[in-house]
């Protein structure tokens, strides 16, 4: 949709005079507070980048994390809210000047805000000042191009293309955003509450912009009567006419009244008033001089902004947008001193809509914008450099610190390296402990930490359950009966294979039955180590180990070490220790594809229980 030149010119003229800028801030405050939303921003066409919407002014009405006020000034609640917006704007300007030249940045007052004083919503408000939009891009661009309001609910869930600040909105808990085209620009309102679209809210938010504004007068005089009389007298002398000030007549009447009343008290009061008037004039001149020096210093600073960052490669067709051309104006007629001071202040004031982002390097630009009937397309280059200042501030490095902090930077770098090394050592130690824990588990193949912890918990619960079962079923048992070892020979695959079978003393099995059972049962190997018995039964990959010996300290540790050395995974363990004898029944399984012969298993167990 084509943007008329009258809309752009209206926005530019609105922000040229200080009184109009103050009126704009009051209207933004009224818009945000009328519907009780968190902030209000005004976007307008930049004069340095035609066809680009940039941040112009704003009002913050959200939560405040840290408030800094001067003890010498008492402010009302409304003044505190307005002061917060000014403090956020000053912080943005401090970041802006600190990125370009720290030495040239003016000293900041003690009550100024620092990045650590801001909450999430305040950070969203400040960072929004660095964004720029082409018509049709983002919420402000869409509202500007269509000349209709745009309402967005659940802003934290929106996509980055529709809402480039979605990530910032999520961190700041911004839920609803409303953009309304007003006065040649776009009014953006946001809140942390989810508010459904309602036409009456749009009307209430824009009511302050359409109401007729009357000039407001301050109850406190901005300058002394004598100062105004002097200025008026000088202006009259320049014009060649004579003018009489009512204030002079009033002062004369006051003097006559006090003189007629008589008394030294009235004369003393008169002298005090005259001295105060003179001191007010001197202080006003001093302040004016300081302001002039400050603006002259700003003019000398080599600070010229790059184009603001745009989120994608969207280009502007100049044929759809009309930019007003500046034509030479005739020389203005001579004006009085007061009017000249106001015009000088307006010329020195920063131009809204041309603020530079604080997240890119400063360079000198020799390009000058020109206007013609056939304007060339306004191409805004995308900024490749990341937003370094924001990362620096979030990381804890203020942009306005002194330049002589080389030693502090080196110490900070050393502390960072030490922290990284200590964190690496801690992780290595933790990994070693997990490996030790994994080696104590009977059977686990996954090596991630979550699996190791889960298997450990399950294994401990299983052991606890078995201990309870053993304690409940424990009964006095006599010493195991002595067993005899008999060598039984049987044919196996054409070769004679000798295995040892355990035969209990009280067995009723007959010898013919032994031959038949040997064909069906897996091989069993039993060896006697003094008063100790070891039985090994192997079936495919399953292994049954039975150990009976006298109880000793660290006996089970040696047995499990021997089992581990044979690459066996323990499936279950049953243990009993009646009358000083230990009975172990262990079910295990070969961990790999290979198998170990029974006599090697028995020999390893015999050595384990035979150690003293």
UniProtKB/Swiss-Prot annotation:
Q: What is its main location?
A: nucleus
Q: Mind listing the UniProt keywords for this protein, alphabetically?
A: Activator, DNA-binding, Nucleus, Transcription, Transcription regulation
Q: Name one GO cellular component term.
A: nucleus
The places in or outside the cell where this protein is found are: Nucleus
Query: Domain of life here?
Result: Eukaryota
Residue ranges with Polar residues bias: 483-497
Extract one GO BP annotation from the record.
regulation of biosynthetic process
Q: Any coiled-coil ranges, and where?
A: none
Q: MF terms per GO, please?
A: DNA binding; protein dimerization activity
Annotated region Disordered: the residues are 214-235, 470-526
Under the heading PROSITE patterns, the entry gives: BHLH (PS50888)
Q: Which family does it belong to?
A: Belongs to the bHLH protein family.
**Under what name is this protein listed?**
Anthocyanin regulatory R-S protein
The record lists the lineage as: Eukaryota, Viridiplantae, Streptophyta, Embryophyta, Tracheophyta
Q: Which gene encodes it?
A: R-S
């Amino acid at each position: 949709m084509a943007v008329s030149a009258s809309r752009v010119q209206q926005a530019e003229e609105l922000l040229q005079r200080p009184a109009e800028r103050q009126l704009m801030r009051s209207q933004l405050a009224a818009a945000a507070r009328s519907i009780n939303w968190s902030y209000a921003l005004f976007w307008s066409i930049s004069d340095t980048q035609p066809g680009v919407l940039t941040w112009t002014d704003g009002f913050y009405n959200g939560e405040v994390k840290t408030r800094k006020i001067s003890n010498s000034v008492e402010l009302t609640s409304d003044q505190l809210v307005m002061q917060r917006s000014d403090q956020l704007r000053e912080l943005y300007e401090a970041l802006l000047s600190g990125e370009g030249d720290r030495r040239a940045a003016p000293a900041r007052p003690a009550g100024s805000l620092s990045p650590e004083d801001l909450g999430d919503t305040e950070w969203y408000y400040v960072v929004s000042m660095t964004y720029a939009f082409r018509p049709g891009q983002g919420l402000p661009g869409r509202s500007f191009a269509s000349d209709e309001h745009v309402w967005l609910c659940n802003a934290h869930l929106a996509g980055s293309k529709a809402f480039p600040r979605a990530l910032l909105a999520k961190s700041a808990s911004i839920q609803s955003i409303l953009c309304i085209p007003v006065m040649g620009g776009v009014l953006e309102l946001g809140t942390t509450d989810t508010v459904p679209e309602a036409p009456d809210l749009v009307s209430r938010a824009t009511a302050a912009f359409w109401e007729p504004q009357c000039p407001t007068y301050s109850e406190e005089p901005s300058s002394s009567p004598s100062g105004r009389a002097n200025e008026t007298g000088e202006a009259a002398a320049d014009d060649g006419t004579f003018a009489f000030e009512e204030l002079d007549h009033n002062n004369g009447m006051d003097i006559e009244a006090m003189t007629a009343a008589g008394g030294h008290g009235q004369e003393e009061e008169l002298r005090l008033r005259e001295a105060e008037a003179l001191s007010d004039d001197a202080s006003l001149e001093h302040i004016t001089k300081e302001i002039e020096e400050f603006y002259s210093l700003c003019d000398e600073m080599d600070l010229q902004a790059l184009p603001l960052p745009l989120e994608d490669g969207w280009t502007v067709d100049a044929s759809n947008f009309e930019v007003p051309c500046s034509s030479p104006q005739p020389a203005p007629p001579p004006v009085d001193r007061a009017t000249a001071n106001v015009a000088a202040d307006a010329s020195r004031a920063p131009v809204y809509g041309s603020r530079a982002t604080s997240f890119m390097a400063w360079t000198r630009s020799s390009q000058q914008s020109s206007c013609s009937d056939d304007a060339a397309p306004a191409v805004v280059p995308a900024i490749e450099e990341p937003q370094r200042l924001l990362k620096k501030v979030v990381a804890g490095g203020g942009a306005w610190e002194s330049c002589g902090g080389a030693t502090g930077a080196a110490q900070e770098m050393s502390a960072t390296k030490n922290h990284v090394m200590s964190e690496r050592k801690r992780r290595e130690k933790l990994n070693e402990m997990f490996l030790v824990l994994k080696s104590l588990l009977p059977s686990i193949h996954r090596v991630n930490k979550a699996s190791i912890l889960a298997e450990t918990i399950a294994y401990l619960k299983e052991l606890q359950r078995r201990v309870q079962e053993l304690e409940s079923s424990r009964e006095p048992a006599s010493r195991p009966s002595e067993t005899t070892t008999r060598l039984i020979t049987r044919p196996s695959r054409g070769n004679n294979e000798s295995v040892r079978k355990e035969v209990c003393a009280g067995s009723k099995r007959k010898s013919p039955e032994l031959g038949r059972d040997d064909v069906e049962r897996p091989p069993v190997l039993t060896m006697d180590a003094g008063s100790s018995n070891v039985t090994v039964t192997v079936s495919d990959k399953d292994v049954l180990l039975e150990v009976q010996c006298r109880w000793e300290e660290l006996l089970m540790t040696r047995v499990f070490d021997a089992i581990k050395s044979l690459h066996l995974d323990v499936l279950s363990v049953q243990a009993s220790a009646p009358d000083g004898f230990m009975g172990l029944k262990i079910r295990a399984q070969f961990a790999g594809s290979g198998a170990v012969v029974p006599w090697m298993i028995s020999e390893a167990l015999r050595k384990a229980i035979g150690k003293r």
